[in-house]
Amino acid sequence: MTILLALDPGNTESAWLLYDTATGRPTSWAKEPNPFVLTRLDTITADELVIEMVASYGMAVGAEIFDTCVWIGRFIERWHGPYRLIYRPDVKLHLTQTRRAKDANIRQALIDRYGPGKAVAIGLKATPGPLYGLTGDCWSALAVAVTAADAA
């Protein structure tokens, strides 16, 4: 059994998700301020860190992207185990078979993977599915985890 810690990094906050490769399911997740995520790396139990990596797409970038890159470096430095950098176009291609996919397409591909449909994949409070409670950037962290797990 391998546990992946997947990160969708940001310039001030990052989403993290623990993913059990034996069951193919996320076990816990949150979006927290980067300093909290950094200290969490000292206590969280996982076999490998997988991080969505920033890449150049030929467009001008601002300070937020550079700040995110700094945080990625800090996360890697703090983590004392194996890690992989996963690029967003690779996630898109793996989950949707096109690099032109948007976040909504990736989310739907994940729902289809855990479904069929939202009722099974996400569920309701009374009947939660494996993705119940997953919100916002945690979906991106799940996409990174699934892509990394399938590539292993």
What are the language-model segments listed below?
Residues 1-152:
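Phosphate- and other anionic-substrate recognition elements at nucleic-acid/protein interfaces
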